[in-house]
Amino acid sequence: MRSLVDQLDLVRHDYVLVSSGAIACGLSSLGISHKPRQLDLMQASAAVGQSQLMHTYERLFFGKKVVAQLLLSSDDFSSPVRYRNLCNTLNRLLRMRVLPIVNENDSVSVRELEGAFGDNDELSALVAAAVHANWLVLLTNVDGFYHQNGRGKPKLVRVIKRVTPGLEANCSGKSQHGRGGMRSKLRAALRATASGIHVGIANGTEPGVIPRMLNRRIGTYFPPLRVKE
């Protein structure tokens, strides 16, 4: 993560960070080794973990950025008044050179734990549209989207001009620790490109992943489906 922070500092663009991990952090701190089924325990774990997550980001960005926490629910996007307030807050923070760190409000919202957004991939696409972002970069533990042709080794697809049902059907399931996976990233890419946003999926452990993805040298690139107004 320290490497990613340094890369973002060098890129010198305004950016918003959408981060998951509150529940996992909380479970670890509470000494719980399995994902609980009880809703109240999940939400309590999220409350414990979210503060630790923000403390980690404050340390990582110390001397580089002041960070701000925004915990969102689906209502923040479905209500016109709340959505307008969200957009105003995000844009004010960016004008102040403050880094908004966004997560789902897992500690109080039942619908978010049940997947109202689906996962943070969809949330990131919604946030990108809210701030009229030029780029959405989705970092994962693989090098991009791989085409499974049923014969031999899967092939990395460097450019996907349009997300189709066939591409989604080619995806594996959810990730180990979250609700998302490659299918959810494709859906996020579809939503973002429809809003005129460039999208990249890349391996977060790759050296220089941020500038290299922005220059389309690694990962899978999705061009926008329309020109932003």
Positions of predicted regions on the chain:
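C-terminal catalytic "cap/lid" subdomain
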Residues: 1-229
